[in-house]
Structure formats: structure tokens, C-alpha cells
Amino acid sequence: NSAGAAAPGTGPVAAGGDGDDSLYPIAVLIDELRNEDVQLRLNSIKKLSTIALALGVERTRTELLPFLTDTIYDEDEVLLALAEQLGNFTGLVGGPDFAHCLLPPLESLATVEETVVRDKAVESLRQISQEHTPVALEAHFVPLVKRLASGDWFTSRTSACGLFSVCYPRASNAVKAEIRQHFRSLCSDDTPMVRRAAASKLGEFAKVLELDSVKSEIVPLFTNLASDEQDSVRLLAVEACVSIAQLLSQDDLEALVMPTLRQAAEDKSWRVRYMVADKFSELQRAVGPKITLNDLIPAFQNLLKDCEAEVRAAAAHKVKELCENLPIEGRETIIMNQILPCIKELVSDTNQHVKSALASVIMGLSTILGKENTIEHLLPLFLAQLKDECPEVRLNIISNLDCVNEVIGIRQLSQSLLPAIVELAEDAKWRVRLAIIEYMPLLAGQLGVEFFDEKLNSLCMAWLVDHVYAIREAATNNLMKLVQKFGTEWAQNTIVPKVLVMANDPNYLHRMTTLFCINVLSEACGQEITTKQMLPIVLKMAGDQVANVRFNVAKSLQKIGPILDTDALQEEVKPVLQKLGQDEDMDVKYFAQEAISVLALA
């Protein structure tokens, strides 16, 4: 599989004559590096450190690495494993003094066609760069970066972009100037892929440069990349803007960066505007309060009104964070006058993703705006969203109720909440039903026991007989959480009787649900209720004509057994399990015998 270096010889490794085969596997691993079967080569590469340990540092350097360097035309999977292994190889070639021996194979890997392999090779090179001394870095690592940066293939030039920032800080001034020059030329490379790679590393590179170089070199590069003909390059420049903005003073920001950022927020490509919206909170923190008020707020208003739904949704997601990060003084006025009018429009947006994004954060504004504003301005919006035709919107409002509960109490909403909860609870999509069930214990806690018993209890019982198993299962767990919230006395009076009635249901699935409920309720309700109210029902169901029910009786007895006292176990449970242990159905027998042994009733 290789036309280059010979594989490391196996002779000296497997020394020790016929009797000693302890080193034999190494010989096999080395042979497998050349095997026709990809899987065997892959296994061998994954055990590369074992081979290197056996060969010792010198032979790893002189035989194994040249062999690996020459075999780099293999399946991508094998190359990926190799690139990963070599990143942790410094100790196996003799430590930092010899780290440069690992560069040739990784340099080859950094130029292959498959992106995943190149990225892994770059990651390993970045790791190894830290282990070079400054002298070795300039002698071995920097030349590698320069070779990649001026390579004929775009693959090598894209890989170079990820290596500048790790070798720059420790290089001499003359070499630093060369590194900056190479980075500059890659930012204006003819191939869009290379410019993309350079743009994606611009922020990272800016962080390791001297401030003067940031102003004189990075900012012009940022400006050019932000007006590149390819929108995929421009949107990466927006990401870099966050890092660059953190490095500059307010005056420099205003003069050097803001014109470009303003332009990006109005870019003709929606993907660039989307990126501005998506990075809005980071940009806001990076540019500070003054520029936020003068520049970012107007830009944000436009993004919330953007003609592209994706952009509006991304901006809507950021509403709460934007408001939280505004300086407290004057915050309320800005939100009420500049942000809230846009939000009101979004509540009735034509796109459900936009409405859903807004619904997931809008409740958080109540803590920022306080009680009176919430009641007067936000409450009508919440109520409108609770009536929205899209279930996701209603669900997002309901699942964020806790924010509002802290500010105005949930009573204000309870009359409108109820129809919304009922509709979601009966939604045709079972995942929507599932989501509302999972939120029920929190809702119950916020609305209180009277409201719950009057309005929501029947829903919780209805879910127990849903036609989707996942819903029945979630509804069962929901009961347990409710008992933990409202206490055992409530359970005994309200829940347990309703659950036990289902034991006589003609549908065997519903009879089984009774057992599942007892499994989770017994622990929450304790010994007395379990023994007096639940156990008799379980024992009676042992005579059910459906085998599925009978074996679930055995499982239930195993589950509630530890809660019961010894008398009940010996006198009531044991005879029933023994009878089930003789059942004609194999499964019933199996689970009954398992229960007998787990409960030590044999």
C-alpha cells in the first residue's frame, strides 16, 4: 500500500528467540499498517502509540514517521485517525526537542482533499506548536506555515490560515512581519475557499497582534473581507468583528469598524444580515453602551423588520439579551420607545418561526420592565400569543411562565392560560402533548392546588389513556411529580381513587396503565396508602385474562415490594407470585420468578 519508505522492520522488535512471543502483537500491528483491509489499517493506526512505545523513540523517528509520511494516500478514515494520533505523539519521539519530527506527516495531511482530515491535522499542528522551543519554532514550524501559505493547492493555503496565530506570539519581529504578510495575501487570495478560511481566523489572529498592527493591518483586511463579492466571506467577517471590536478604543471603533458593521447590517444578502442578528449580543458587549445606543439599536430595529423571515427570527431570539445588556439608566425608555413597537408587530408576524422565536424570550422582558409595564404593555401580547394558531408559539409562552409569575403572579393570566393549555393538551401532534405534560408539574406549582384540581386534574387523567405510549408513560411520571408537590394526603383523596378505577377498564392497555401509575405513586405515597389502597388492586389483577397484564402485575409487585412490610409480603404477595410462577405463559412465569428472587421470598 506504499511505494515510499519501507515499513519499520519487525526483526529487532520481536527479539528473544522462539520462546518469547510477548512482542509478537507489535509485529502484527506493523504488518497491518500495510494490509489491504481498511479496517485492519485503521485498527493499527489507532494503536500507533503502542507501536511507537515498542519501537522506542529513535526508531519511531527514523523508521515509523518516514513510513507514515510516505503512506499518506489512504482512505480518509485512516488519515483522520492518523492526524489525531500524531497530535499526542511528542512524548513518543523523544519530547519537545524532537517535536519537529512530527511535522512532515502532518504537513502532508494538512494538504489532502478531505476537509475533516485537514482540520484534524491543523488541530494537531496547533497542539504540537506549543511544544516547540522558540528556536525550533522558527527553524521548523514557521517554514512549514510559509510553505502551506504559498502552496499551489488551495487546500494547503486554507490549512495555513489556522496556524498563523499559534506561531506569531513567539516569533522574532522580522518573522512576525513575514507572517503578517502571508496572512494579508491569503485574505485576498483568488480562491473564495481560502478567503473564507482567512476570514474565519481573522478575529483569532487579531487577538495575538500588537495594537498598532491591528489598526494598520487587520482593520483594512476586515473592511475588504466585509465587502468581498462572496456573501460566505462577508458573513465570516461579521464574526471576526466581535474579536476586533474588543481590542479597540471607542474612538477607533467609531472611525474604523462601525462604518463596515453598519454596512453589514444592511447587506444585500440575507445571510450576512442574519449573521449580524445572530451575533448581536456579542457585538453589543464588544462595542459598549454608547455605540449600542447610537448605532446598534437602530440597526436592531431594522433587523426586527427585515424582509427575510430567517433574519427577523434571529433578531427576535436576541430581544431579551439585548434589553438585559442595556445600561440600567434609561433602559426602560429605550425598550418602551424603540424596541416594544417592533415587538408588537412581530406578535402577528406571518411567519411562525418568527413568532415562535419571540415567544421563547418575550416573557423575560417582564422582569426587566417591572410590574406596571408588564400588566399594561406585555400582558396583552402574552394573551395574543396564547391564542396563536401555531402550537409552538403557545407552548413557548407556557413554558416560560415562571418569568412572569415572579413579576405579576400568574393569576392575571390564568383565565387565558386555561384554554391554551387544554388545546395543547389535546393537540393532534403527540410531541406537543408531550411537551405540555412535561411542563405540568411547574404549572401546577405556580397555579396552586385549588386551580389545579378544578381545571387541570381531568387533563392529567385523560393523558393516562392516550393512544400514544410515550404520552401514557410521561403522564404516569407527571403524577409522581404532582404528588411530590401537593403531598400524600392530596394524592390519597384526588389521584389514587381515579387511578384505581382504571383497573376495571375493558381496554387492557388502560388496565396496565393502572399498574404503571402504582409503580411510580407507591414511592411518593408511602407504606400505608400503598398497602391499604394499591396492593389489593394489584393482587386482584393477577387473575387478569391478558398475559401482558399478569406479567406487569409481577413487575409491579417487585417494584412496590420494598415499600411493604414483611407481613404483607409473606401473607399476600408471596402466594400470588407463587401462583404466577406456575402460569402457562412463559413471560409471566419469568417475571414472577424474578420478583420472588429479588424480594427474597423463595
Swiss-Prot record:
Keyword Repeat: yes
Pfam families (UniProt xref): HEAT, HEAT_2, PPP2R1A-like_HEAT
Keywords, sorted A to Z: Repeat
GO CC terms in record: cytoplasm; cytosol; nucleus; protein phosphatase type 2A complex
GO molecular function: protein phosphatase regulator activity
Domain of life: Eukaryota
HEAT repeats (start-end): 21-59, 60-97, 98-136, 137-174, 175-213, 214-252, 253-291, 292-334, 335-373, 374-412, 413-451, 452-490, 491-529, 530-568, 569-602
GO BP: meiotic sister chromatid cohesion, centromeric; spindle assembly
Statement: the UniProt record of this protein carries the keyword Iron-sulfur: no
PROSITE patterns in alphabetical order: HEAT_REPEAT
Domains: entry comment: Each HEAT repeat appears to consist of two alpha helices joined by a hydrophilic region, the intrarepeat loop. The repeat units may be arranged laterally to form a rod-like structure.
Function of the protein: The PR65 subunit of protein phosphatase 2A serves as a scaffolding molecule to coordinate the assembly of the catalytic subunit and a variable regulatory B subunit.
Quaternary structure and partners: PP2A exists in several trimeric forms, all of which consist of a core composed of a catalytic subunit associated with a 65 kDa regulatory subunit (PR65) (subunit A). The core complex associates with a third, variable subunit (subunit B), which confers distinct properties to the holoenzyme. Interacts with IPO9. Interacts with SGO1. Interacts with RAF1.
Protein family (similarity comment): Belongs to the phosphatase 2A regulatory subunit A family.
Protein name according to UniProt: Serine/threonine-protein phosphatase 2A 65 kDa regulatory subunit A beta isoform
Natural source organism: Sus scrofa
